[in-house]
Amino acid sequence: MEERKHETMNPAHVLFDRFVQATTCKGTLKAFQELCDHLELKPKDYRSFYHKLKSKLNYWKAKALWAKLDKRGSHKDYKKGKACTNTKCLIIGAGPCGLRTAIDLSLLGAKVVVIEKRDAFSRNNVLHLWPFTIHDLRGLGAKKFYGKFCAGAIDHISIRQLQLILLKVALILGIEIHVNVEFQGLIQPPEDQENERIGWRALVHPKTHPVSEYEFEVIIGGDGRRNTLEGFRRKEFRGKLAIAITANFINRNTTAEAKVEEISGVAFIFNQKFFQELREATGIDLENIVYYKDDTHYFVMTAKKQSLLDKGVILHDYADTELLLSRENVDQEALLSYAREAADFSTQQQLPSLDFAINHYGQPDVAMFDFTCMYASENAALVREQNGHQLLVALVGDSLLEPFWPMGTGIARGFLAAMDSAWMVRSWSLGTSPLEVLAERESIYRLLPQTTPENVSKNFSQYSIDPVTRYPNINVNFLRPSQVRHLYDTGETKDIHLEMESLVNSRTTPKLTRNESVARSSKLLGWCQRQTDGYAGVNVTDLTMSWKSGLALCAIIHRYRPDLIDFDSLDEQNVEKNNQLAFDIAEKELGISPIMTGKEMASVGEPDKLSMVMYLTQFYEMFKDSLPSSDTLDLNAEEKAVLIASTRSPISFLSKLGQTISRKRSPKDKKEKDLDGAGKRRKTSQSEEEEAPRGHRGERPTLVSTLTDRRMDVAVGNQNKVKYMATQLLAKFEENAPAQSIGIRRQGSMKKEFPQNLGGSDTCYFCQKRVYVMERLSAEGKFFHRSCFKCEYCATTLRLSAYAYDIEDGKFYCKPHYCYRLSGYAQRKRPAVAPLSGKEAKGPLQDGATTDANGRANAVASSTERTPGSGVNGLEEPSIAKRLRGTPERIELENYRLSLRQAEALQEVPEETQAEHNLSSVLDTGAEEDVASSSSESEMEEEGEEEEEEPRLPPSDLGGVPWKEAVRIHALLKGKSEEELEASKSFGPGNEEEEEEEEEYEEEEEEDYDEEEEESSEAGNQRLQQVMHAADPLEIQADVHWTHIREREEEERMAPASESSASGAPLDENDLEEDVDSEPAEIEGEAAEDGDPGDTGAELDDDQHWSDSPSDADRELRLPCPAEGEAELELRVSEDEEKLPASPKHQERGPSQATSPIRSPQESALLFIPVHSPSTEGPQLPPVPAATQEKSPEERLFPEPLLPKEKPKADAPSDLKAVHSPIRSQPVTLPEARTPVSPGSPQPQPPVAASTPPPSPLPICSQPQPSTEATVPSPTQSPIRFQPAPAKTSTPLAPLPVQSQSDTKDRLGSPLAVDEALRRSDLVEEFWMKSAEIRRSLGLTPVDRSKGPEPSFPTPAFRPVSLKSYSVEKSPQDEGLHLLKPLSIPKRLGLPKPEGEPLSLPTPRSPSDRELRSAQEERRELSSSSGLGLHGSSSNMKTLGSQSFNTSDSAMLTPPSSPPPPPPPGEEPATLRRKLREAEPNASVVPPPLPATWMRPPREPAQPPREEVRKSFVESVEEIPFADDVEDTYDDKTEDSSLQEKFFTPPSCWPRPEKPRHPPLAKENGRLPALEGTLQPQKRGLPLVSAEAKELAEERMRAREKSVKSQALRDAMARQLSRMQQMELASGAPRPRKASSAPSQGKERRPDSPTRPTLRGSEEPTLKHEATSEEVLSPPSDSGGPDGSFTSSEGSSGKSKKRSSLFSPRRNKKEKKSKGEGRPPEKPSSNLLEEAAAKPKSLWKSVFSGYKKDKKKKADDKSCPSTPSSGATVDSGKHRVLPVVRAELQLRRQLSFSEDSDLSSDDVLEKSSQKSRREPRTYTEEELNAKLTRRVQKAARRQAKQEELKRLHRAQIIQRQLQQVEERQRRLEERGVAVEKALRGEAGMGKKDDPKLMQEWFKLVQEKNAMVRYESELMIFARELELEDRQSRLQQELRERMAVEDHLKTEEELSEEKQILNEMLEVVEQRDSLVALLEEQRLREREEDKDLEAAMLSKGFSLNWS
């Protein structure tokens, strides 16, 4: 520790930290220059710079980064940096792609210079990241620079942050970066090369810049512009007018904001209802919208022009886009209002304030972009040669391929192109010939536009610059050098360019020409003659008169599908009937739209040749590859069925689109078209079919119309097949449904009844104008222009594959509005819509958003108040002139351009100012965050860094307390219950916000961990779950569907919960501690990774992360804190009260809590208030006074003056507020509150203390109550907060376990202990540096802080004590959770003196905090798992873990604010027991605290009260019956919330284990007897976890593993088990360490804290698996066992890990990993979910069966009186149920522990007794199952979220492609009409029968058919997506519902469940049918398409560049 201590004083290390933490471009460059100057390094020496820097900077924080960069640089492709040693490169633009390219080139050994014309990174816009980009950036050390990088479910990052990350990496690698240098052109080498060999140079501004002298041979354009470098021709894809609006709002990181769900892309085709509601409410008409929560709230939306005109954003309508979007034509104020309104509505008015961030001109950050034209370069590179010097010119990023933003392809494809370019430069440098280099580059580039997350290689770890590692089926030699000769420019011949281009086109698209042969009429005619040969009455001689009778058409159909037509019955004379029959069958069965009616055909003299060519071409394309039925007479029935299906099934565009680089992607290619022929039709049918199924017969009309729609067009012909199939499917689906004949004709119905008044096929049904063949569409027997085919209600353009038709009034509707057709609603609504678009629209919006008549006024007003600039800027902006570029650069209107003149005068706002305004909340915590992240840059950082950072956030008060308070209150009012509101009020809005921030941060961090473990999808869910878990206990009680309640509450409380996260403040403390711990841990962890022996921190980090996660869990608990949280608090209080009879208030609460959680929250608030006011505290904390007397560890560590100071610092008022809303307050007071928190913590401890009123330190609980903190109002205020900041709270925590405190103090408190802790936590030291300020604010002196950090580790010190004997770690958590327990553990560890002394918990604050966090998380998990139980046991736990618990449950913390109610008379022993335990066996004392926490059940006397309380709880929260369910929810949240929590779910159980600590456990273990006497009071708890129970748990886990179908899930579970075991082992090892200091203690500890033993058990070889599985699988069981206290897999492992990491870096890291692995089980869960998604039914079965089992088990548990409080109480009943098993398990674990840690039998006995004490909290099989179920549910939720995001992105892609198709069709129609007019002589030139024109006509017809098929494929894909999405949502809902036992549901609920199941089965059927068709087609195409590469190429080049 000493080394690290001094390390931080090393100026180089300080400078490095400053560099890593820099938040601006200039700041980064300056910090780096200072670092280089100090180290005397010169970046100019690029070859050795990095190695010199590495050798000179021997800093543990930097080593983690070196390890990552060394790993990347060691790849074989880089040839150790010698691949490009003499290559000089210039890169234009320091954007993400330019910098990414520079990094790879530098690793190749090239000299790289980057020039950037600005010196600020000001783009707040957020980029979506594909999984491989996240992996890639992590490999470059992104987490080292930006701790929050892709935390949790987050898969996006702001451009600014991404640039900063890459800039820092580039600088470290020795890349020269010059800012304020603008590239203006290339300077060719002079002709006179004899005198001076000068090569290519750049013309830059300023001209005198040294870069102007730089000669290079490679130049790469990465500035995003279209014309920077010459020679690149562009392909343009013009889609529908697409106007994108981006807006950035300030993110204050409040809880309210944290709970708003992101919108990862809502595409209109995917969720039409949302957009229609938006339009009706606000008049805003969007095509899609995306919302990402990053440094800012980032929105990007595509607005429809008409909507912008209606809302006054665009003043005048111009056809020219440049004029349309010119600055003069845009009302900036209206634009701001539009963006704000859309953002407000899309987030359901949940964002408290929408204040615009500012751009780099100080204007509101809103911009409009024209996405109508997307450009892609035709080639990626070229070579120029002048005067003997060759120059390789390349493009990357947007300059190469412009992305369509909503699809998130920009960075992904940009990075792929960057790596491809690096590979090209490598080949160039290795001497490959220029043409070969170019040919390879272009071969690779053709695949780039087609890449999707699904069709790139999935093995991200193998990615390198070699394209083969990234593109699955790439042929790098696809193009030959001769085909790219035109890209070699010698400046001599310009003609070669054109020649070569034509050559390339002819060579590269061999298949495009294949269809041209069809263009010849003779070929088509010949085919028709062959098909009709032999049919009576049919003689085809031409393409007109031969077809008039209709027999020829019927003959072709009969030839291939004799089942459809009885040819022999046809009458040659009945022309109309024959033709109509053929048209109808072709449309219905084959998907070929008619071009006229039978009546028309009969009436015309000669059928129109052009029309017939178009119509017959579709038959040709459909059947050309099929065998006629006559050739299939020898086929069996099966084969025939397949054949028929082949003409029906939709093309499998789906598979091509998503799975492989699409061969069919580009409908343009003719070959493609050929290939698609058959499939296209099918697709169409499918798409319609998809829709049809949706309608069902009742909606059939809609379907019919839909089907009709399918008759896409003449071209659609084939589609109709699909439609037909759809119809068939529909019919199948609807057979059971009542047929509804609303007048809407089924698609299948023949449309013989053509209206007589129709003008025929050449007159538009809608506009009555002429319809030319090429532009003709037909549906329902009507013909019309494509542009006229609109919804009667909303005027949206319809597609043939998706419409509804009302036969009665002959009107067409989009499906969503079909229901309005009869109601007159349409008439009413339509007009309304128009007004809506005006101010009226604003009105409704305002209502929704609580705005004034000025739809935006209120929001604007408030936002303006907050950001005065926004309004003003907005006004100014309208005048801003748009910047027009001479070249067609993308038209973008950025607000800063006030006018052309003003623009010049406009001054750029410094980046710092911009950041300060936009990121105030982030930056406040940012510095610390950054520090934390930088200091723990190790993997831990990666895994848990976010957590640290997030906590830091809370310290900053973003908006000012009053504003924040207002916001908080507003949020609370909006989404919280009254209780929640009260809580929030008591907390104080400011604090709330901070807490919210913290919570958000913490959640993110938690998520980060989760994500790292489970990947991004789950994190989001985690958050929700956390919030949900935080759901009001009351609600939980009341709501049978705990999960739903949780979700609802989660949402409602989110603000409160977040605020409870205010615990966030504690989190902050935790964060600080975590930072201390975690950063060091991270750092250490990384070091460990690097092999640094001092990497203890790494594990700590993990632990911290876990702790953080628990914090998150706590947060979850807290989240509910306002409502649920408070309820929880009350519940806990009630439990505490039961524990502490002394506190009548609490006792009252106990029952009242159970009965009226609402009141509880209020009381909680009061409690918090007491915390606020010492006087209140006094009475409420009477027991606390004892603790106070004892002095919270903090006080002990820090003189009282300090504490008071801290309290004042804590902003006693704020703290009071915080106390009011414990959770919220905490965040606000975080730093200060933390210190006060420690007193507060004691307060929470007081419940324990109350429980054990005895003044002895042991009754930490009681003592803590009396603890100084209790006296100190500030601390009281901070209790909640400090809880979140367990480190600080840790002190109180220590007091809680006074003995522990003493021990800790001895350990931590004593200088030696502190030093030891410090050594263990160099990271802590670093953290200190980072959190020194926080600590100071907390009131801790830096020294104290350092102690704290040590103690932080001590918390881990606590843990250290725990760590030494791993049980201690648990015990610390137990301490955290059950302070007494931890204390006793320390005693066991041999910290007997801590018993009396208040532990130096304050010192271990951070660690303690962490522990607390872990404990809290455990508790939270407990609370989540036990729900009320948590609260009940929580009281003691609160006392003990008030810090951690407080953190974890702000609500729970409420008791801390007010001393927890005295334990019930029986329970009081909890504290006493703790004392006893501590006294008898030090560890023993500690365990009792846990029992205190969980003691209720454990304490026999208290147990009945607890059970009663729990019962009341259960009664109040009906869930108690499923306390497990509650646990589930909590667990889910917890797990989701934090990885720790996940394991902590079992921790939740820990408290329970504490019960098991009771003699029963000991007895079971056989050691109990010894401990029994000591722990006899806890004996009741004994049954908690027995060895048997553990075995059961393990077996259960294994069984689950077997039942789990997903291999990934199974693996994850196995990993978790092993991890748990490892962790336990690790904890065992750490314990031994502690044991070394206190061998007996270590041993004692293990017995002492069954939880620990459980952990140990897990650790133990014997119990490892069991414990692990138990912990993982059935945390309850684990909990019951030693896990109960800490064993819970996550909790225990997390804590043990932390401790171990404190003491043994390596192990910590491993443990960390195991933890991660442990998490993986959840991940496996996710995998399971994925599998489930694949096989919905089986998945549901597996998941649901799990649930059911769990539920049943839960029910059984519930049956036990205690069960209701399944958390802590899970009670004696359950514990009793599994006492023997648990005892056995515990014995085993203890045995293993003893084996592991040389625990003496006494120790083991002590442990068993402790275990037994905890054991009462032991989990029964059901509980374990319930926990596992919860885990699976969580994983499932995360998986579902991930899948949902994927679907959304796919939907966006489809939407974009449909737009492109529409635009292409429009252009084709224009050309087709012109050709048709010429052919018909209508062009004024007379009738021309020009063969060239006819040839052109054939080509156009084919193209149109291809487009129609392509569109139908897209629609099928969209339909499949829709069904998939629906199924997923139903599945999730069903899963949530089935998590509740049937007997708890009402009839209505059961019937709803049945309905959902039925609907889901229907959807599954539809999907199965659809997928079967698609798969069939896919197989056929594989047969047909042998030349995949060629097809890809054709598609690639004609591909739409989205």
Curated annotation (Swiss-Prot):
Residues 1821-1992 form a coiled coil. Residues 1841-1990 form the bMERB domain. Residues 1239-1258, 1456-1467 have a biased composition (Pro residues). Residues 1150-1163, 1268-1280, 1288-1302, 1436-1451, 1760-1769 have a biased composition (Polar residues). Residues 518-624 form the Calponin-homology (CH) domain. Belongs to the Mical family. The bivalent Mical/EHBP Rab binding (bMERB) domain, mediates binding to predominantly Rab8, Rab10, Rab10, Rab13 and Rab15 (in their GTP-bound forms). Interacts with RAB1B, RAB8A, RAB10, RAB13 and RAB15 (in their GTP-bound forms); binding to RAB1B is of low affinity compared to other Rab proteins; at least in case of RAB8A can bind 2 molecules of RAB8A simultaneously through a high and a low affinity binding site, respectively. Interacts with ERC1 and RAB8A; may bridge ERC1 with RAB8A. Interacts with KIF23 and ERC1; enhances the interaction between KIF23 and ERC1. Interacts with NINL isoform 2. This is [F-actin]-monooxygenase MICAL3. It comes from Homo sapiens (Human). The lineage of its organism: Eukaryota, Metazoa, Chordata, Craniata, Vertebrata.
